[in-house]
């Protein structure tokens, strides 16, 4: 055959897939949850959110995530393409759910353009939140997300984070995580 040079570095080809699998193999086996139907997400918090929301929907007799779907954290948007390339040659049903912010837009569009995943299989939180930019956390009601962060940080009642506080702290973004981060940066060092 000889060496072939291609401008499409992310195309899937059996001859190029094996070295990628070998290179990523160790890292992936350390944190991988893979199944025939797989949702690739950015991080472990996304796995927890999707599992908790699915269980809550199931308890309410509503449509929930089919248990045949496995949720796999990839370690960030930058690694989703590698994971998708790695698994695409294995006849797996793969979809991805990722954040969609200013720094993510070009990466998401590049992932869609590579066609590693079938059309319609690259989903963003913005596809479901109704906001132009979103993280998976934006799928929660802002009151619930603020209460979760308040509880996780062990903040006293007078320091509880509210959606109003969050919006005031970062009015230039609609992303709840960025807003709550701004509130947290303004908390006194001795907080809670």
Where are these regions (language model features)?
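RecA-like P-loop NTPase motor core
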Residues: 1-103
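Activity-critical C-terminal alpha-helical subdomain
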Residues: 99-191
